[in-house]
């Protein structure tokens, strides 16, 4: 059986398969979680729930760090007979490291230096899992930028290009990596099947791209509209994201251009080493950027997003 943890207010629009069962989980309360999970016994758990945008930095910790702690604590207290627990973390836990050219791949042996509240909250969740040690069968996945159907951040780029504007930041070379959502799913199932306890794996499509590669492919799939390509210095982005953050807090609506986004867009090196995932999990990405963008844009068109 497959169960999906949802909130009472969660949309189930894309969870229409009749084989899916639903369970309401409140990750903010261990007491509530214990009541909700006690009647069940799960063999495998994929913890992909998390916040990527918050008005206040502390909210990242409440959801991404504390929510993970609460879930794991309750599973241990209930002595749930879990075979494997896959935690979906992020490459963002490492922050801007190995930024000297020529850029080198970020590896599992590097010291994380997260520069976003999101990355810091994910790292704290990882460290909590590490602190439990062999008492809990966990595997951690660290995908780079994930794109595909229903993803909203990269969709904003496609929407902007359709409106004839492509915006980039910084004049220093930027090496970017991507991973299509289906390749992340592949890695999740491989980790569930034979992942080694306590191991951590980076995920990408195995290639490295320059900053314009993604927008060029979007442009191609949109029929090559004319575009105004704007490349602004980093200090302009700093001003825009500062006011975006301020207005977001004033209006209660988080801006896509905020303080975390500033650090993400400013970062120049997103290379990562996926060899351990390939060697140990048997992970082999099937969606290079051109194929993935084609599928993503088709979905956006078919579903009226573009």
Which residues fall in each region the model found?
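Mid/C-terminal beta-alpha module of Rossmann-like enzyme folds, strongest
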Residues: 191-257, 290, 294-297, 304-305
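Substrate-positioning beta->alpha
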Residues: 124, 151-156, 169-192, 198-199
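Flexible, glycine-rich beta-alpha linker
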Residues: 94, 139-156
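Conserved C-terminal active-site "lid" loop/helix of NAD(P)H-dependent oxidoreductases
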Residues: 181, 216, 240-284
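Active-site Tyr-X1-5-Lys
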Residues: 113-141
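NAD(P)H-binding glycine-rich loop region in Rossmannoid oxidoreductase-like domains
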Residues: 21-66, 91-96
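Amphipathic terminal alpha-helices
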Residues: 272-280, 284-306
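Conserved Rossmann-fold NAD(P)-dependent oxidoreductase catalytic core, especially the SDR/UDP-sugar
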Residues: 69-117, 139
């Amino acid at each position: 059986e497959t169960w999906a943890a949802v909130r009472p207010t969660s949309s189930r629009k894309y969870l229409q398969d009749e084989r899916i069962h639903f369970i309401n989980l409140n990750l903010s309360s261990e007491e509530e979680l214990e009541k909700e999970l006690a009647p069940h016994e799960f063999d495998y758990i994929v913890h992909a729930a998390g916040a990527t945008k918050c008005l206040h930095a502390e909210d990242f910790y409440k959801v991404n760090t504390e929510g993970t702690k609460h879930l794991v604590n309750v599973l241990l207290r209930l002595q749930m007979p879990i075979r494997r627990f896959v935690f979906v973390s992020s490459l963002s836990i490492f922050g801007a490291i190995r930024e000297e050219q020529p850029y080198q791949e970020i590896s599992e042996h590097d010291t994380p230096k997260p520069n976003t509240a999101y990355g810091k909250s994910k790292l704290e969740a990882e460290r909590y899992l590490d602190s439990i040690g062999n008492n809990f069968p966990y595997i951690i996945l660290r995908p780079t930028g994930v794109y595909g159907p229903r993803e909203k951040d990269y969709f904003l780029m496609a929407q902007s290009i359709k409106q004839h504007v492509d915006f980039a930041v910084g004049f220093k070379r930027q090496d970017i990596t991507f991973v299509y959502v289906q390749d992340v799913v592949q890695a999740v199932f491989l980790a569930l099947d034979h992942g080694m306890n306590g191991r951590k794996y980076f995920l990408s499509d195995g290639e490295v791209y320059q900053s314009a590669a993604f927008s060029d492919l979007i442009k191609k799939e949109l029929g090559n509209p004319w575009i105004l390509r704007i490349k602004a210095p980093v200090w302009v982005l700093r001003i825009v994201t500062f006011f975006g953050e301020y207005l977001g807090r004033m209006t209660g609506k988080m801006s896509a251009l905020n303080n975390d986004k500033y650090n993400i867009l400013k970062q120049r090196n997103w290379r990562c080493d996926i060899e351990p995932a390939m060697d140990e999990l048997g992970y082999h990405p099937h969606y290079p950027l051109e194929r993935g963008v084609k599928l993503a844009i088709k979905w956006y068109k078919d579903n009226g997003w573009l």
